Amino acid sequence: MPSLKDLKNRIASVKATQKITKAMKMVAAAKLRRAQEAAEAARPYSQRMGAVLANITAAVSDADGAPLLMTGTGKSDVHLLVVCTAERGLCGGFNSQIARFARDHVRKLLAEGKTVKIFTVGKKGYDILRREYASLIIERKELRDVKRVGFENADALGKRIIEMFEAGEFDVCTLFYSEFKSVISQVPTGLQLIPASAPAVVEEDAAHKGAVYEYEPDAASILADLIPRNISVQIFRALLENVAGEMGSKMSAMDNATRNAGEMINKLTLSYNRQRQAQITKELIEIISGAEAL
């Protein structure tokens, strides 16, 4: 049984930890608001670009000269999986959820006889996936020193992926990230970047419904410029969704940790008081017994 001194030290230690988790929860809540606003602001732009891309793709789908990023290599033998996770932990199952989703996809592709290559974005994803698939990880990127994710970070990743594609390193590229739904709900998502598949048709508003589009100089040339930018835009949106999801998970995890610390403090305090009461009772009995002996 721990002594009173041990219990007192443990209570003090848990209280100190509780202060830290409470502070981390407040910081995560403040960051979550900004991250959520950024993620929600990026969605309309990303969706509208997808609609424009789908419209132009329809115009050149049967034409010659379509860019290779759209048509692909004609094969699907080598797959590049770009797995985006957080740089740090203490955010519940956020990172493991994305890694598990990507790992299931890896197993499926390997079972089909495909060659798989992994590009990790974020330290935690690398740490998790290297335990089982270290030989498949061909590149990693960390954003630990980036205070706030910007389009330039996503653009650099997009250019690197395109560079690898043009060098013939893979046939299909899929992006894995966590789509932010709410503080307690983040959904692991896979998005094919290359070949650039036409997005689901987005319903046009009344002002543009039934409109006929003309492209200058031509649709294929526009696609050649638009697809690389769309890849960067989709990566940027994924990074923003990840930041919002990470902060939501961290806030929830730190809230649970704070409440658990409170419960532990109550139990330890109860144990301390009971032991102290028993010790005082024992001392009183000894004093009374000694007095009676006299």
From Swiss-Prot:
UniProt topology in membrane: Peripheral membrane protein
Keywords, alphabetical: ATP synthesis, Cell inner membrane, Cell membrane, CF(1), Hydrogen ion transport, Ion transport, Membrane, Transport
Gene Ontology cellular component list: plasma membrane; proton-transporting ATP synthase complex
GO biological process per UniProt: proton motive force-driven plasma membrane ATP synthesis
Major place of residence: membrane
One Pfam match: ATP-synt
Compartments where located: Cell inner membrane
PANTHER family recorded: ATP SYNTHASE GAMMA CHAIN, ATP SYNTHASE SUBUNIT GAMMA, MITOCHONDRIAL
Function: Produces ATP from ADP in the presence of a proton gradient across the membrane. The gamma chain is believed to be important in regulating ATPase activity and the flow of protons through the CF(0) complex.
Subunit structure: F-type ATPases have 2 components, CF(1) - the catalytic core - and CF(0) - the membrane proton channel. CF(1) has five subunits: alpha(3), beta(3), gamma(1), delta(1), epsilon(1). CF(0) has three main subunits: a, b and c.
Cross-referenced NCBIfam families: ATPsyn_F1gamma, PRK05621.1-4
Name under which the protein is recorded: ATP synthase gamma chain
Record organism: Rhizobium rhizogenes (strain K84 / ATCC BAA-868)
Annotated gene: atpG
